[in-house]
């Protein structure tokens, strides 16, 4: 079977009977064995849980589960409590993590745990466990160290979480400067869980007593622990998830997509299109511009995007409307010569979507490579000038000031409004011209996640220069606002969030 893991997060109350049974089978076959410390007759027996155990979890509206499937096979699950305390603080406690033996060390556990602990605006993240690797993952995901002295200051909050976790006995928590233990009445064979990290955490959290587990928590107010390698891994992971982040934008519900007809009016005039013109839509997303052209009778239409999910949506709309558009999955940084076009549209910040400046310039080169001589393109990019004027979070070099990014407020802007110009939620790196955001996605049928999104923004002079240096004559480059592309704004007008460029291939 090909390994193509698929993830999702749902409320436990939404688990089907089939999923409940799959969780039971996964746990019972892969969790471990009893130590026999509470009952010698159980020693060596597999620890098993019935489907009813998981069904009971569904009675608590604060219980969630993240699942990993490969086809129909459940590879892993992470159950967790997500609770808002009376003071409004959000907390997450992972109550169970299991991964199929045959699929361990492939990053499944980390992805599942990130869905529970990866939201940076929470007050506390934690679990009870005998597995040192899981404690290390908690520290890695939250950028903080598990410290018994800090845990001891928050026993009231932890007690409120214990009230919703049947196995956690808040009356038997032992925390001091050398230990952090909680009685869970659980007796797994601890020796088989030992690894190279075990002694490290025994020295910090204490020796695990019979029936107890480590109580491991980190908290929002703790100092963050920065590591260069970890930093690079976080940014690289987020870059790899860029496709997923853009595909999860609920574009049909976002206000900036309401002006499609007006935008196509502009494109038709700027490119002098006739019904026989061949048009390429680069970074088409759900295909709204290509669909509008098809609706108007244009027949020779092609649209590229790197997200199969967005293209599936676009194809469905085209089929429903009876439109013929050639949708293809392509990375627009690397378009090979083949079909040539009379006009290309590349709208809403496709150029600028990547951290590396050269990647964004590669899109410009790709456009030139598929555009007929004398053909025109219409491109929009995010306006760095307004971004810099309005920035309230800025550093000269984010790599030298990582805390600025780690402490940046998170939002669900991409999933909800698409307003990526809200200065409260972005950090400007003035040396690289990268704009960082922490984007959260929840309860959309996919894995709950927080990603660090970095986009490159251009000044008007910079985008003109980029096109002129790559084989184009720039015909116009204007500051514009939504729904008024034919009414350019003056420099300094804070309504001009986009720079709209029309260029002709030389």
Regions found by a protein language model. Name each.
Residues 378-466:
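SAM-dependent methyltransferase
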Residues 237-274:
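Conserved class I S-adenosyl-L-methionine
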Residues 30-94:
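A conserved beta-strand-loop-helix scaffold within acyl/acetyltransferase catalytic domains
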Residues 336-343:
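A short acidic, Gly/Pro-enriched loop at the edge of an enzyme's catalytic core
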Residues 361-373:
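A short glycine-rich, Lys/Arg-flanked "PGG" loop and its adjoining helix->strand segment in the class I
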Residues 99, 105-117:
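Conserved acetyl-CoA-binding loop-helix of GNAT-fold acetyltransferases
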Residues 1-20, 24-35, 118-236, 240:
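Terminal substrate-recognition subdomain of acyl/acetyltransferases
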Residues 290-334:
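Class I SAM-dependent methyltransferase SAM/SAH-binding core
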């Amino acid at each position: 079977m090909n390994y193509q893991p698929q993830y999702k997060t749902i409320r436990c109350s939404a688990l089907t009977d089939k999923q409940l049974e799959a969780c039971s089978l996964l746990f019972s076959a892969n969790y471990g064995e009893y130590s026999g410390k509470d009952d010698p007759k159980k020693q060596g027996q597999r620890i098993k849980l019935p489907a009813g155990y998981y069904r009971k979890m569904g009675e608590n509206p604060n219980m969630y589960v993240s699942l990993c499937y490969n086809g129909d096979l459940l590879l892993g699950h992470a159950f967790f409590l997500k609770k808002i305390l009376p003071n409004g603080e959000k907390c997450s406690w992972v109550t169970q993590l299991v991964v199929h033996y045959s699929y361990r060390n492939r990053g499944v556990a980390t992805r599942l745990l990130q869905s529970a602990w990866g939201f940076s605006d929470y007050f506390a993240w934690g679990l009870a466990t005998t597995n040192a690797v899981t404690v290390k993952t908690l520290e890695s995901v939250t950028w903080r160290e598990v410290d018994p002295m800090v845990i001891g200051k928050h026993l009231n909050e932890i007690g409120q979480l214990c009230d919703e976790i049947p196995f956690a006995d808040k009356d038997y928590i032992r925390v001091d400067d050398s230990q952090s233990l909680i009685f869970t009445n659980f007796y797994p064979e601890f020796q088989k869980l030992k690894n190279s990290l075990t002694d490290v955490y025994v020295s910090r959290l204490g020796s695990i007593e019979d029936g107890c587990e480590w109580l491991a928590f980190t908290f929002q107010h703790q100092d963050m622990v920065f590591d260069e390698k970890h930093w690079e891994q976080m940014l690289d992971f987020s870059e790899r998830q860029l496709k997923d982040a853009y595909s999860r934008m609920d574009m049909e519900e976002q206000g900036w997509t309401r002006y499609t007809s007006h935008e196509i009016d502009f494109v038709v005039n700027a490119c002098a299109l006739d019904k026989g013109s061949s048009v390429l839509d680069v970074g088409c997303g759900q295909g709204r511009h290509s669909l509008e052209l098809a609706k108007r009778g244009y027949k020779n239409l092609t649209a590229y995007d790197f997200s199969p999910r967005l293209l599936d949506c676009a194809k469905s709309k085209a089929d429903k409307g009876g439109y013929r558009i050639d949708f293809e999955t392509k990375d627009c940084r690397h378009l090979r010569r083949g079909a040539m076009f009379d006009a290309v549209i590349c709208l809403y910040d496709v150029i600028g979507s990547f951290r590396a400046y050269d990647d964004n310039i590669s899109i410009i080169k790709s456009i030139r490579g598929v555009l007929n001589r004398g053909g025109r393109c219409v491109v929009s990019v995010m306006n760095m000038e307004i971004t810099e004027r309005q920035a309230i979070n800025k550093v000269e070099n984010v790599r030298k000031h990582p805390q600025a990014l780690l402490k940046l407020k998170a939002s669900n802007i991409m999933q909800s409004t698409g307003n990526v110009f809200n200065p409260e939620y972005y950090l400007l790196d003035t040396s690289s011209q990268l704009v960082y955001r922490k984007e959260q996605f929840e309860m959309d049928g996919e894995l709950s996640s927080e990603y660090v999104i970095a986009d490159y923004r251009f000044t008007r002079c910079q985008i003109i220069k980029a096109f002129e240096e790559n084989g184009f004559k720039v015909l116009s480059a204007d500051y514009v606002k939504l729904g008024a592309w034919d009414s350019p704004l003056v420099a300094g007008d804070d309504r001009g969030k986009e720079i709209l460029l029309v260029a002709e291939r030389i």
